[in-house]
């Protein structure tokens, strides 16, 4: 019996269902139910919440979410070997766990939500974690279909998500994430907590969507950030040339010094340049 419910410990679940982690699926199983409960509590309040979980594996986080009061969990699992273990959890929490055997990169959970808002809570497979986050950050319309994300990443990715100007990890991901969300690293988890242990420390990050991000066209913002950080050590007057407009004109119209580098520009500066880029291109 585990610490949070009357289901078997996760090591026993893995043994029963022969769930060896597959590197090809980016799997690292978190077996400490105290840690999975800590992740679940980070998404509080859970009462009456619908949770979308990606890559539940043997179900440690799934169990924590349900035990701590989530009304409904939609668990999207690509690995068919994990489905029987999740079905055992569903039997323990009847009517509260919906198991989807599918690929989170292509599966859209919104039709299952019946118009209700949800929270995304997941120990994401490392090999698709960043792209999944970008998919969620670029969803339209905004505000999005979720009202919170509590996600685990490699520490280096977590630092990029929360980074702001003049920080070493600041880049395209930080611009997009902090433009649309309030972000925070909540805590780290050591490699020893996982089976198999990854080579790096993991971080749990919370992202809360902003109801009204600074107004600009998202695609223009992504283009400006991609150009600027594509040559991050060069001044904007050089790095922005790839946009096909006069970089000096663009920066000046946005109130940004074209002799500065991308890593020193706040999100408001990127937003201003994105708006000016849209105006310049609309002029033909």
Swiss-Prot record:
EC number: 2.1.1.182
Keyword field: Cytoplasm, Methyltransferase, RNA-binding, rRNA processing, S-adenosyl-L-methionine, Transferase
UniProt GO MF annotations: 16S rRNA (adenine(1518)-N(6)/adenine(1519)-N(6))-dimethyltransferase activity; RNA binding; rRNA (adenine-N6,N6-)-dimethyltransferase activity
PROSITE patterns with a match to the protein in the record: RRNA_A_DIMETH, SAM_RNA_A_N6_MT
EC top class named in words: transferase
InterPro entries assigned: KsgA/Erm (IPR001737), rRNA_Ade_diMease-like_C (IPR023165), rRNA_Ade_Mease_Trfase_CS (IPR020596), rRNA_Ade_methylase_Trfase_N (IPR020598), rRNA_adenine_dimethylase (IPR011530), SAM-dependent_MTases_sf (IPR029063)
Catalyzed chemical reaction(s): adenosine(1518)/adenosine(1519) in 16S rRNA + 4 S-adenosyl-L-methionine = N(6)-dimethyladenosine(1518)/N(6)-dimethyladenosine(1519) in 16S rRNA + 4 S-adenosyl-L-homocysteine + 4 H(+)
GO term, biological process aspect, one: rRNA methylation
GO cellular component annotations of the record: cytosol
Compartments, as annotated in UniProt: Cytoplasm
Any Pfam family the entry gives: RrnaAD
Residues annotated for S-adenosyl-L-methionine binding in this entry: 28, 30, 55, 77, 103, 123
Superkingdom of origin: Bacteria
Sequence similarity: Belongs to the class I-like SAM-binding methyltransferase superfamily. rRNA adenine N(6)-methyltransferase family. RsmA subfamily.
Function comment: Specifically dimethylates two adjacent adenosines (A1518 and A1519) in the loop of a conserved hairpin near the 3'-end of 16S rRNA in the 30S particle. May play a critical role in biogenesis of 30S subunits.
Annotated protein name in UniProt: Ribosomal RNA small subunit methyltransferase A
């Amino acid at each position: 019996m585990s610490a949070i419910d009357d289901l078997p410990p996760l090591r026993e679940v893995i043994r029963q269902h022969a769930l060896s982690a597959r590197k090809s699926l980016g799997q690292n199983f978190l077996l400490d139910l105290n840690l999975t409960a800590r992740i679940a509590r980070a998404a509080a309040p859970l009462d009456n919440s619908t949770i979308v979980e990606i890559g539940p594996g043997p179900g440690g986080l799934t169990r924590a979410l349900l035990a701590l009061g989530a009304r409904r969990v939609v668990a999207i699992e690509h690995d068919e070997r994990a489905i029987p273990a999740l079905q055992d959890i569903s039997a323990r929490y009847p009517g509260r766990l919906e198991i989807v055997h599918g690929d989170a990169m292509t599966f859209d959970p919104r039709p299952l939500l019946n118009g209700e808002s949800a929270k995304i809570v997941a120990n994401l497979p490392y090999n698709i974690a960043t792209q999944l986050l970008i998919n969620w950050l670029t969803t339209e319309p905004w505000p999005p279909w979720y009202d919170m994300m509590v996600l685990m990443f490699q520490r280096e990715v977590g630092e990029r998500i929360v980074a702001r100007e003049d920080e070493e990890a600041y880049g395209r991901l930080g611009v997009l994430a902090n433009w649309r969300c309030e972000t925070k690293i909540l805590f780290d988890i050591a490699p020893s907590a996982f089976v198999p242990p990854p080579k790096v420390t993991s971080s749990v990050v919370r992202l809360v969507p902003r109801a009204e991000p600074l107004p600009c066209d998202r695609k223009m913002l992504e283009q400006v950030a991609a150009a600027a950080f594509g040559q991050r050590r060069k001044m904007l007057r050089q790095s922005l040339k790839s946009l096909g407009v006069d970089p000096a004109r663009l920066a000046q119209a946005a109130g940004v010094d074209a002799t500065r580098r991308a890593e020193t520009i706040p999100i408001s500066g990127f937003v201003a340049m994105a708006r000016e880029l849209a105006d310049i291109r609309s002029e033909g």
